[in-house]
Amino acid sequence: MLDNFNQPKGSTIGVLKDGRTIQEAFDSLPRLESFSGSTATDKLRAAITLGVSEVAIGPVEGNGGRPYEFGDVVIPYPLRIVGCGSQGINVTKGTVLKRSAGASFMFHFTGEGQAQRPMGGGLFNINLNGDTATALGDIIKVTQWSYFKANNCAFQNMAGWGIRLKDVMESNISGNLFRRLGGPSGGGILFDDVRSAVTDNVNNLHIEDNTFALMSGPWIGSTANSNPDLIWIVRNKFEFDGTPAAPNTVDSYVLDFQQLSRAFIQDNGFTHFTTERNRYVGVLRVGATAVGTIKFEDNLLFACESAGLIAGGIVVSRGNVNNQGSATTAIKQFTNTSSKLCKLERVINVQSNGNVSVGQQILPDGYINMAELPGNTRLPSEYDADGETTSVLRVPANTQVRQWSVPKMYKDGLTVTKVTVRAKGAAAGAILSLQSGSTVLSTKSIDAGVWKNYVFYVKANQLQETLQLRNTGTADVLADGMVFGKVDYIDWDFAIAPGTLAAGAKYTTPNQSYLDVAGMRVQAVSIPMFDGPTTGLQVWVEATSANGSFVVVMKNDTGSELVTTVTRCRVRAFVS
């Protein structure tokens, strides 16, 4: 019935399609007091026995000014419980419910034991409270259910959980208040263990446009056997504005997921979470057994101490902003120990005066994180403080690093390309080989314990559909990222030893073959450059074969002996 409002978005006054006002619609619902029973719990159970689809609960004035008390009410079908709203946070007016003393929960929407899964139902326009501020258990439980909704409600005043979800799908929790909840054994919303199989989980759940405040424990969290999947946590407010009756006894995180997969945590506001404020050491923690992709994007982490800890999962973090006073007091970036690919961009720090004190990370043009490339072997990703984007691949000996497709534009028979790889050896004996199919094009010995750039050139006639890098050595390689692209020139640097030249004498450098590097694509060469003075010498480049090689000639054109000190020569070979 309440889905049929003909009401413009944002309006507080509306009518049904049949012309009735909202108040008339509410008054036409079956009222709690119309059912038999001596207590509110008894009356609601009587309504459930009759199978009514909706029950309206009026303001506390109809109950002598006291909250309606409910305890351990099991709801086995899609019942809608509708209130008339409430006034104020610590309410005394409106539809106010309270869990009965000694109860484990207030309401349990459960499809267990049903021939068919319940679809629909939920809570609307109600203020729901625990029996005491230190009571444990749950206010609401939902099990084996689809299309559950909790809209425009408040969940408050208990050390247990506001909402516990188990095997709940296609559901929505939006426009609610979660406040004065949680403790060492509680929190706001919990994704509980799977019911029987891993697919009996919480999935396709939207938690949107809610306000969370004054809580302990995880404000949203999951257990180690929960497997939540396809979760939206969007446009919520998470604000620390005090500690509830049951404070945290261990370091805690606002969003704390032991397991999570395919999640969108976006456009939320987090405020004032620090160790000094109820031991909130970070905003987000993802456990080591998390497996799927989690996007943490475009959130405002104002006056927060730390972004959090990523121990598992494939986490993408970008567009997040902090507002600390300076770079030295800016938010601590994510700690990443996940063995899976994570791409964690810096949380930007913008001071109150508008100055950016911690900005975006600048990456080289065309830079690709190695872990983002495809491959034929699952490789562990690990944290390295000196990694370009913190996640690097550990590649065992005799294993493919990654492979990539060559752009068709480069396969014109004319283009020479360059691969620059940032890598380090875990120990001596690491070797990187660039291959086209099974053909080895070039190899590089990788120094142990130090990050360096290693450059490979690929001739035009070597560019096949794909290229690959392999560790062909005997030690692990840590591979960070690479840049692959067309080159216009190659700087050719080599050792020379002209020594002392008599008057009129010439020195010819060792032969330099560019055939294996650039093929026959060299169009021109530059004037040779040296690492010392060449006063009195004539220098030039001579081609030495039709297959692509050259020497540099140095001639003493003076009338006396010349002592040279140069030891290296560089020639730029233009290939485009």
UniProtKB/Swiss-Prot annotation:
What's the main place this protein lives? virion
Superkingdom of the source? Answer: Viruses
What GO biological process term is on the record, naming one?
Answer: symbiont entry into host cell via disruption of host cell envelope
Q: How changing D241N affects the protein?
A: 15000 times decreased enzymatic activity
Provide the Gene Ontology terms for cellular component. virus tail
Keyword Ion transport in the entry? The reply is: no
The record's section on InterPro entries has:
Pectin_lyas_fold (IPR012334), Pectin_lyase_fold/virulence (IPR011050)
- What outcome is documented for mutating E170Q in this protein? 2000 times decreased enzymatic activity
| Spans annotated as Lectin-like | 488-576
Q: Where in the cell is it found?
A: Virion
Q: Show the segment(s) annotated as Carbohydrate binding.
A: 380-487
Q: For the region Catalytic, what residue ranges are annotated?
A: 34-360
Alphabetic keyword roster:
Degradation of host capsule during virus entry, Degradation of host cell envelope components during virus entry, Host-virus interaction, Viral attachment to host adhesion receptor, Viral attachment to host cell, Viral tail protein, Virion, Virus entry into host cell
Tell me which residues this entry annotates as catalytic.
Answer: E170, D229, E239, D241
The answer on whether this UniProt entry bears the keyword RNA-binding reads: no
What note about domains is in the entry? Consists in a catalytic region, a carbohydrate binding region and a lectin-like region. The active site consists of catalytic dyads Asp-Glu located at the interface between 2 adjacent subunits. The lectin-like region is probably involved in trimerization.
Family indicated by similarity:
In the N-terminal section; belongs to the Przondovirus depolymerase 2 family.
Q: How does it assemble?
A: Homotrimer. The 3 parallel chains are tightly packed together to form an elongated structure of approximately 7 x 12 nm. Interacts (via N-terminus) with depolymerase 1 (via N-terminus); this interaction probably gives rise to a branched tailspike.
Q: What does this protein do?
A: Functions as a receptor binding protein (RBP) and probably mediates the attachment to the host capsular exopolysaccharides. Displays a depolymerase activity that specifically degrades the K21-type polysaccharides Klebsiella pneumoniae capsule, which allows the phage to reach the host cell membrane and bind the entry receptor.
Q: What protein name is recorded for this chain? A: Depolymerase 2, capsule K21-specific
